[in-house]
Swiss-Prot record:
InterPro entries: AGO2, ArgoL1, ArgoL2, Argonaute_Mid_dom, Argonaute_N, PAZ_dom, PAZ_dom_sf, Piwi. It comes from Xenopus tropicalis. Component of the RISC loading complex (RLC), or micro-RNA (miRNA) loading complex (miRLC), which is composed of dicer1, ago2 and tarbp2. Note that the trimeric RLC/miRLC is also referred to as RISC. One of its GO terms (molecular function) is miRNA binding. Residues 839-850 have a biased composition (Polar residues). This is Protein argonaute-2. A divalent metal cation binds at residues 609, 681, 819. Belongs to the argonaute family. Ago subfamily. Residues 232-351 form the PAZ domain. It comes from the Eukaryota. GO terms for biological process: miRNA-mediated gene silencing by inhibition of translation; miRNA-mediated gene silencing by mRNA destabilization; negative regulation of translational initiation; positive regulation of nuclear-transcribed mRNA catabolic process, deadenylation-dependent decay; positive regulation of nuclear-transcribed mRNA poly(A) tail shortening; pre-miRNA processing; regulation of DNA-templated transcription; regulatory ncRNA-mediated gene silencing. The gene is ago2. Residues 599-602, 662-672 are annotated as: Interaction with GW182 family members.
């Protein structure tokens, strides 16, 4: 409750701002600049902007009828500016964001308390369209205030000035290209880049205005995304259903073909081809079950009588068009209740529609191949982009007196020292054997485990093999060789597998998983592991993980058939890394002497992530995962996972999840952590305040619920991978690997970072393909008062503790594990989602039950809970 005076009468306009929460958390200022590591000269794809110290005038635009796409809104405003030049706009060049906001460099002749209403006519294909546009003054946006913020004289960067500058810089590109988010795309001229399934790659560029130390910067990057190919719907259908040509499809579609086709085309816009120049556009809402020859609709005759007429007959009578493919279904377009049907052959897919549905595995790999660029090539492409964009000749940018430098920004980075990695030795062979403690030193983010043994290897005495690959492809000889090789490699790694598997059988289909696993659990006492061999991508995988992780609490390790047919030391060694950890072993640890001071007291590292279902899927829940370290190395982690509201970014049950992890930490170590380091993945800048407010309070609440005075210091760090900052070596000799990337450990916290807050870029991994993307870390809260060096070194070291490989990874292990846990929970939900998605109109009551069923489905078995089942 807010305390205060009695009620005050407020005029109805303008709308008052929403009340802020009783207190807001403010991110900490940057404590200092890092100095650790050797310096390296870099260039960043940031271009300095020269901003005048003027005022910009902000107006609100209201277009009726509403809900036009931005492209249409832009046309309306452009027509308005031309048409009312004499009365209102004169020589001014306003910029518009496509929604509500219009900015001018000089004020318009509109009184501040008045609203001007104009009528704008857009010439249409059939008839002209008339719109009513209202303009009213909103505010003056001071660019002087921006200068004050960048130089540290103001505590925070005014959001409205950045928004205004962004609109100025995006106005012309938005008219020329197809905008998607903060990027602009255009169809590749001359050379198509097909992805299959009616999709293709469009190339473009990302552009955003960013505040940095002392200067505003323009961040420019090359960008690519999937669009639907503009083509006849018949051809689109052939691509989706893998028909060589339409001629081979003389029969109606089967149910499964129709369902697959519907899934792909639903929601897309098509244009008709049978009405000459009038290419009306419609949005597809469904595909009919019946072919055009049998699909009927109520047709009103001239006499006023209504008769049922087939689509094929209607096109013959009305349009003198005999359908070539009457055996194919129709598209249902517009509103579902209106029964508007179009034969496939009179429709084309409208150009410029971005594909938001999930790409298939093949499409994803084609996309990566088409878009991967070595760092020097990408640098050259970005420079070329800047030259062709030529912002300094853009009339709208010049109108506001803005200049942009043509060259990338020079930045001094630092390459941090990698930590030493400690392995173990043969402890169980002979009591007096020397402990072969081996230390590995990463070089360019990679180290070698050869001649070394796990820090703590597990002895495997009882294990089983279940082969779901066909016996003729994966023979008994293959299985025998695989078993021998795995035992040899595991022995060398210090994880001895004693004896042959207690069970080795062939099986088929997901339905046989649970009965087989129950038999194994009941028959073989002390069974530690089931190795499952899979024939490529199959539903068996999801079922193995569901049964193993959530139903019976059994450790499982899946192996692809091709890796059994041809074993390599590398794949077997990688298998051992995963198996040892799943069974409670420790592969390696950070050398204790080299760890940062934060390890001097009990500390828990938490990683958190929320994964959302693919776009266009409105039913599936989002999944929140939080993992916590369970030892001082830190090496072992425990996981908690929840389903939550569809596309909800804030972790709703965080307090209970953190409480569970703190209890587990205490059980594992007999210590209460005095510090909590929380790495939060997957939050965009616009959500910082909201996420921080809710989640920091949730972590505090978890502590206080355990003990009234328990107040460990919390450091809350957001980890971001989905940004467009790229760093390039200035000196050719510093470039690493085939792709010419920056070295692993490269850190930047000056010039391109936030003017006042605590953030930094760290590229902790060695780039293998394409240009490395440094991770961006933004500290939103810090009770522990880290210096820049301490936090940067700690973060870099945690990137070396990921158990699945002997390389440093691109984000700290706890954040990576949270991602794996959420991803695994998707598999646990597979059949539950299928069940609950069958009927789309479920009542409110059953939804509550569905929610409970989903929550239960991701609940991991008690025996699995304390293991790293997700590794």
């Amino acid at each position: 409750m807010y305390a205060g005076a009695g009620p005050v009468l407020v005029p109805p306009t303008p709308t008052p701002p929403l009340p802020m929460p009783a207190y807001t958390f403010k991110p900490p200022p940057r404590p200092d600049f890092g100095t650790s590591g050797r310096t390296i000269k870099l260039q960043a794809n940031f271009f300095e902007m020269d901003i005048p110290k003027i005022e910009i005038y902000h107006y609100e635009i209201d277009i009726k009828p509403e809900k036009c796409p931005r492209r249409v809104n832009r046309e309306i405003v452009e027509h308005m500016v031309q048409h009312f030049k004499a009365q209102i706009f004169g020589d001014r060049k306003p910029v518009f964001d496509g929604r509500k906001n219009l900015y001018t460099a000089m004020p318009l002749p509109i009184a501040r308390d008045k609203q001007v209403e104009l009528e704008v006519t857009l010439p249409g294909e059939g008839k002209d369209r008339i719109f009513k546009v209202a303009i009213k003054w909103m505010a003056c946006v001071s660019l002087q205030a921006l200068h004050d913020a960048l130089s540290g004289r103001l505590p925070s960067v005014p959001f409205e000035t950045i928004q205004a500058l962004d609109v100025v810089m995006r106005h012309l590109p938005s008219m020329r290209y197809t905008p998607v988010g903060r990027s602009f795309f255009t169809a590749s001229e001359g050379c198509a880049n097909p992805l299959g399934g009616g999709r293709e790659v469009w190339f473009g560029f990302h552009q955003s205005v960013r505040p940095s130390l002392w200067k505003m910067m323009l961040n420019i990057d090359v960008s690519a995304t999937a669009f639907y190919k503009a083509q006849p719907v018949i051809e689109f259908m052939c691509e989706v259903l893998d028909f060589k040509s339409i001629e081979e499809q003389q029969k109606p579609l089967t149910d499964s073909q129709r369902v697959k086709f519907t899934k792909e085309i639903k929601g897309l816009k098509v244009e008709i081809t049978h009405c000459g120049q009038m290419k009306r556009k419609y949005r597809v809402c469904n595909v009919t079950r019946r072919p055009a020859s049998h699909q009927t609709f109520p047709l009103q005759q001239e006499s006023g009588q209504t008769v049922e007429c087939t689509v094929a007959q209607y096109f013959k009578d009305r349009h003198k068009l005999v359908l070539r493919y009457p055996h194919l279904p129709c598209l249902q377009v517009g509103q579902e209740q209106k029964h508007t049907y179009l034969p496939l052959e009179v429709c084309n897919i409208v150009a410029g529609q971005r594909c938001i549905k999930k790409l298939t595995d093949n499409q994803t790999s084609t996309m990566i191949r088409a878009t991967a660029r070595s760092a020097p090539d990408r640098q050259e492409e970005i420079s070329k982009l800047m030259r062709s964009a030529s912002f300094n000749t853009d009339p709208f940018v010049r109108e506001f007196g803005i200049m942009v430098k043509d060259d990338m920004t020079d930045v001094t980075g630092r390459v941090l020292q990698p930590p030493s990695i400690l392995y173990g030795g043969r402890v169980w062979e002979e009591p007096n054997a020397p402990l072969n403690k081996a230390i590995a030193t990463p070089v360019q983010g990679v180290w070698d485990m050869r001649n070394k043994q796990f820090h703590t290897g597990i002895e495997i005495k009882v294990w089983a093999i279940a082969c779901f690959a066909p016996q003729r492809q994966c023979t008994e000889v293959h299985l025998k060789t695989f078993t021998e090789q795995l035992r040899k490699i595991s022995r060398d790694a210090g994880m001895p597998i004693q004896g042959q598997p207690c069970f080795c059988k062939y099986a088929q289909g997901a339905d046989s998983v649970e009965p087989m696993f129950r038999h194994l659990k009941n028959t073989y006492t002390g069974l530690q592991l089931v190795v499952v061999i899979l024939p490529g991508k199959t539903p068996v995988y999801a079922e193995v993980k569901r049964v193993g992780d959530t139903v019976l609490g059994m450790a499982t390790q899946c192996v692809q058939m091709k890796n059994v047919q041809r074993t390599t030391p590398q794949t077997l060694s990688n298998l051992c890394l995963k198996i040892n950890v799943k069974l409670g072993g420790v592969n390696n640890i950070l050398l204790p002497q080299g760890r940062p001071p934060v390890f001097q007291q009990p500390v828990i590292f938490l990683g958190a992530d929320v994964t959302h279902p693919p776009a266009g899927d409105g039913k599936k829940p989002s999944i929140a995962a939080v993992v916590g370290s369970m030892d001082a190395h830190p090496n072992r982690y425990c996981a908690t996972v929840r389903v939550q509201q569809h596309r909800q970014e804030i972790i709703q049950d965080l307090s209970a999840m953190v409480r569970e992890l703190l209890i587990q930490f205490y059980k594992s170590t007999r210590f209460k952590p005095t510090r909590i380091i929380f790495y939060r993945d997957g939050v965009s800048e616009g959500q910082f305040q909201q996420v921080l407010h809710h989640e920091l309070l949730a972590i505090r609440e978890a502590c206080i619920k355990l003990e009234k005075d328990y107040q460990p210091g919390i450091t809350f760090i957001v980890v971001q991978k989905r940004h467009h900052t790229r760093l390039f070596c200035t000196d050719r000799n510093e470039r690493v690997g085939k792709s010419g990337n920056i070295p692993a450990g490269t850190t930047v916290d000056t010039k391109i970072t936030h003017p006042s807050e605590f953030d930094f870029y760290l590229c902790s991994h060695a780039g293998i393909q394409g240009t490395s993307r440094p991770s961006h870390y933004h500290v939103l809260w810090d009770d522990n008062r880290f210096s820049s060096d301490e936090l940067q070194i700690l973060t870099y070291q945690l990137c070396h503790t990921y158990v699945r490989c002997t390389r440093s990874v691109s984000i700290p292990a706890p954040a990576y594990y949270a991602h794996l846990v959420a991803f695994r929970a998707r598999y646990h939900l597979v059949d539950k989602e299928h069940d609950s998605a069958e009927g789309s109109h479920t009542s409110g009551q059953s939804n509550g039950r569905d929610q409970q069923a989903l929550a239960k489905a991701v609940q991991v078995h008690q025996d699995t809970l304390r293991t790293m089942y997700f590794a």
